[in-house]
Amino acid sequence: MPSGRRRVAKLPTRSLILNEVERLIARKGVYGFTLQDVAGPLGVQVPAIYKHFKSRDDVLIELSRRFIEGLSRQFAPAPRSGRDPAATLKRRLEEFVDFHLDNPAYVRLSLVDFATPEGGMEYLTLASGGPLHETPHIGPLASMHRHLAALLDAGRKAGKFREVVALDFYLIVKSVLLIRLVFRNDSLLTGEPTPVQVAETKSTLWDVARRYLALNPNLNINGRTSKRR
């Protein structure tokens, strides 16, 4: 007679390895663990990992591909045409924050890439098919950049935003968010962020974006025109 319990499908070993590596990176950092640390909780020996991946770097590149796939879906167009571009961008930036908070290992891998622009191993760069200045045109992130550019252009045509280079805008919001997540400490990554912390992070990012896109370059943090002294 059926027990009534649903069977949970066992993940392939390759996926289990990637999941454990993701957990370790979030907790210990990109260089804070060994393959033995990965193998132990899975109940396997290190040679078993080499049946699926050529090296530790190969594991990290494959994990990066997983994150790049998720990142490629950011800044999607509004489901309904005619929606206010500013409201859509605000919502997409909130989702951008959620993506980073939900994937702390991705944040740490991003910081490694920024820290090794030449030399070293740039895992996300390899996974995305090239350096950041090339990804708007090639590779899996091209669609994300295309959607962001279209959203910014819609805001410009609606008289909401000034004209900006989409990649410049992306670099600004990305950099501000990374700094917000790790400075002064990385408690937003290692712990469970409170609703207040999440709301403050989203508010900060939207404020930066709003000021950068403002038609009036003298717009201050309160949305008012700064007085020249």
Task: Locate the predicted segments by residue.
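C-terminal peripheral helix-coil segments that are non-catalytic and often amphipathic
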Residues: M1-P2, E95-D98, A142, R146-A158, ...
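Short hydrophobic clusters on alpha-helical segments that form packing/core surfaces
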Residues: I17-I25, F67, L71, F96, ...
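Alpha-helical DNA-contacting segments of helix-turn-helix folds
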Residues: L60-F67, M144
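Amphipathic alpha-helical packing segments from all-alpha helical-bundle domains
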Residues: A76, A87, E118-A158, L167-L171, ...
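Amphipathic alpha-helical segments used for helix-helix packing
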Residues: L101-P131, V182-S187
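Helix-turn-helix
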Residues: P12-L16, L24-D58, E62
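Hydrophobic alpha-helical connector segments
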Residues: E62, A76-R108, F169-V173, K202, ...
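Short, Lys/Arg-enriched C-terminal cap helix and immediately downstream tail that follows
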Residues: I61-E62, S72, L181
